Design a protein with these regions (language model features):
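Short, intrinsically disordered, charge-balanced linker/junction segments flanking boundaries
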Residues: 189-193
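N-terminal beta-alpha lobe that positions the nucleotide/phosphoryl donor
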Residues: 1-185
């Protein structure tokens, strides 16, 4: 396994800095509830290192920092435009080939194919702030099927680090933007019936 992918079965709460609270909790549930007969859908996480690799491979870190550095922190008059431009930079990037290959290989291991749906869920991480909660600030996508839609959903999750509400939340709570990354959980969908 690379630094960019972690299986839920190998993730524990101590991994919050790498995979975020949501993915760490899923790893804990899979590890400790499965033996009690509680079924937890399997999955894997694209780590914060994978997020930064995507950002740096597309050479957009400085551009994003520049945009966030010009944010009007008093009235937030340019918040909407700042968020939009940051998201456009992320969505305009290209998935690094090796990262895409790793994601798709794990998707196949999970049983992913044209008819197998997964949830693609954001899980934010904050360096040196494992207690930080970003619940509800970032996007998740359900019933994703197929290679291209999966990679697009991962990119959309990465971009959701820069929604207006996520930027404002970090500003309101004193989190430095460059210290927050996004991990993405990819988990089997299960039918409710």
């Amino acid at each position: 396994m690379s630094a960019y992918i972690r299986l839920f079965k190998d993730i524990r709460i101590a991994d919050v800095p790498s995979v975020g609270g949501k993915n760490a909790s899923l790893g804990e549930m899979l590890a400790f509830l499965s033996s009690e007969g509680i079924r937890v859908p399997d999955g894997f996480a694209v780590t914060a290192a994978g997020f930064w690799y995507y950002i740096d491979s597309n050479n957009i870190r400085n551009a994003i920092s520049g945009l966030l550095g010009k944010l009007d922190r008093e009235k937030f008059s340019n918040l909407k435009e700042t968020g939009k431009r940051c998201r456009e930079l992320v969505l305009g990037g290209k998935m690094p080939e090796d990262l895409g290959v790793e994601i798709l290989a794990q998707y196949r291991e999970l049983g992913g194919g044209a008819s197998d749906a997964v949830a693609v869920r954001s899980s934010a991480t904050a360096e040196d702030l494992p207690e930080a909660s970003f619940a509800g600030q970032h996007e998740s996508y359900l019933n994703i099927q197929g290679d291209k839609p999966l990679l697009e959903a991962v990119q959309k999750c990465f971009a959701s680090l820069f929604t207006d509400r996520a930027i404002k939340y970090r500003e309101d709570n004193g989190f430095a933007h460059e210290k927050v990354a996004l991990s993405v959980g990819i988990q089997k969908m299960v039918r409710s019936d």
